[in-house]
Regions:
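Active-site-proximal alpha-helical scaffolds that flank and shape metal-associated catalytic sites
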Residues: 68-140
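Short N-terminal binding/cap micro-motifs at the start of the first secondary-structure element
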Residues: 21
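Alpha-helical transmembrane segments of integral membrane proteins, especially early/N-terminal helices
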Residues: 1-9, 91
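His/Met- and acidic-residue-enriched segments that coordinate or traffic transition-metal cofactors
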Residues: 24
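Alpha-helical bundle segments that constitute or directly flank the non-heme di-iron/ferroxidase center
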Residues: 8-18, 27-63, 82, 123, ...
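Charge-dense, low-complexity intrinsically disordered segments
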Residues: 1, 31, 67
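Short linear motifs at secondary-structure transitions and domain/linker junctions
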Residues: 1-2, 13-14, 104-106
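A short linear-motif detector with a strong N-terminal bias
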Residues: 3-5, 18, 108-112
């Protein structure tokens, strides 16, 4: 079994729990208000704006044995660069105040997640970044 399949298997119940959260169910049914969607986008902005800096930090902390990962990180950076601006554009399109979001602060859960990731990269295992990426990419 590949690592990806092992990871998918090991996290199946947690992913199922997440997908059954009331807000996710409402999204699946298209039963959310514009305000709720703008709130979601606002919090998404606060972590997405850190994706490229986190990837850069990850690449910088990897040992020589992970040189092969750096090329993939460079491609990932190129793919992700500017996505935070897409979110702000979506907020504007929904009638939200994108500049207030740009200059605002995240909620505590997003702040803690981002802080944990920077700490994990600097003091723990930089490859830990990819766990968060797997969760967020898998639910978006």
């Amino acid at each position: 079994m590949s690592f990806y399949h092992t990871l998918q298997h090991a996290t199946a119940s947690a992913r199922e729990h997440l997908f059954n959260a009331p807000i996710i169910e409402a999204c699946r049914k298209g039963d959310i208000s514009r305000g709720t969607y703008v709130d979601f986008l606002s919090q998404a902005y606060y972590h997405v704006r850190h994706t490229v800096p986190l990837l850069m930090a990850t690449g910088g902390k990897l040992g020589q044995e992970y040189e092969w990962v750096r090329g993939a990180i460079a491609e990932y950076i190129e793919e992700e660069y500017g996505h935070q601006e897409w979110i702000l554009n979506d907020i504007r399109a929904c009638g939200g105040d994108a500049e207030a979001v740009r200059h605002g602060q995240p909620g505590l859960p997003i702040e803690l997640m981002v802080a944990f990731l920077y700490d994990q990269i600097q003091r723990g295992n930089p490859m830990g970044f990819f766990g968060m990426a797997q969760v967020l990419e898998g639910t978006s």
